[in-house]
Amino acid sequence: MFEKNLNGKFLFVRHGLTEFNKIQNETHSESIEFIGEYSDAVLSQEGIAQAINAQKFINNIKIEKVYCSPLKRALETCLKIFESHPNKDNIIIEVFPLVTEFLNICYDFPNSIEENKKIYNMNSKVKFNWKSFEEIFGEKQNLFFLSYLDNLNEEEYNKFYKIFEEANKNKTMDKAIEELVKYKKENNISTLESYKHIFNRTQEFKKYLKEKHIGSIDDLSQKIIIVTHGGFIKFSTSKSVLNQKAFNDWPKDCCFADNCEFISVNI
């Protein structure tokens, strides 16, 4: 189902290390998960170095297409990885909503898609195309993630939809995210997005890739790169999950990707 190499057609890449990752790895503290300021975290200096180091693998590869998560850490990783690619002027990175992180703690949420678009766009060092977001979500792009919160009941969903609409207007998204994640803990909600939903997202994306690239799927001379997150990669790389009936945890045979590690995934 997956290999840790560059041999396949579809290469999934986890973003570089962030300060959140670093603190979480060192302290193993759950309290950091409820701090709104860590939403949409950027790369640490180590994470930037990891992405730059990945250039030595990418620069020798012919690129057919790049897809990227809308979160800052993935966008920044993408920029750093491709900024010295010999064909970078012809590479257009498609920012794709489906490949965002599994939504559960503050760190998993974006603060402002509008602000991210101001930094990462067609005028950046590497070109970023947000057409998918604009076509699917229109004026609601900043709130796209709300449709993924399937473990909230209807009343809870409507309550937080209003909270996020107001926060979006007042530019206080980090506070709304913090309120949501604390509410989850206080009300014993296992995860905000269900494991079943993230699984369905990965399958929908794989189906999209097959259909979109049907004419070149066997051409291994040009690669399709997906810059995404650990949670998304876990469900994208499991074989056993395809026959799974209950979705209560990560699949046991999934890939736990390191930061800026390339994973060749069978689509």
Predicted regions and their residues:
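Conserved alpha/beta-hydrolase "nucleophile elbow" surrounding the catalytic nucleophile
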Residues: 71, 229-230
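A short, structured active-site edge motif that brings together acidic residues
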Residues: 89-109, 129-140
